Amino acid sequence: MEPEKTYQYLEDLAEKIGISIRYEDLSGELTARSGLCKIKGRYLYIMDTSRDLTKRIELLSQCLSQMNLEGIYIIPAIRDLIERSR
């Protein structure tokens, strides 16, 4: 699967399970590089815009690997990617 399609699928899956993704340039003085947080009961994943697509796929896969995805159909290639990220 092309990296762009892979990332789009991961992004759609995150939204489907209630994770909003916000893109921010974190290359300044912050030590954070991307991550999941919970604000007022809602999940928010802050993605560093300075990360390349391969790293974004890795980061979002790691995030999703920690979530309960039971009962959600995920195409095999994406499910394998998420499983390998654990």
Q: Where are these predicted regions, by residue range?
A:
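Auxiliary, metal-adjacent structural segments of Zn-dependent hydrolase domains
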Residues: 1-32, 39
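Active-site scaffold of zinc-dependent metalloenzymes
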Residues: 31-54
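Solvent-exposed, non-transmembrane amphipathic alpha-helical segments
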Residues: 9, 30, 34, 41, ...
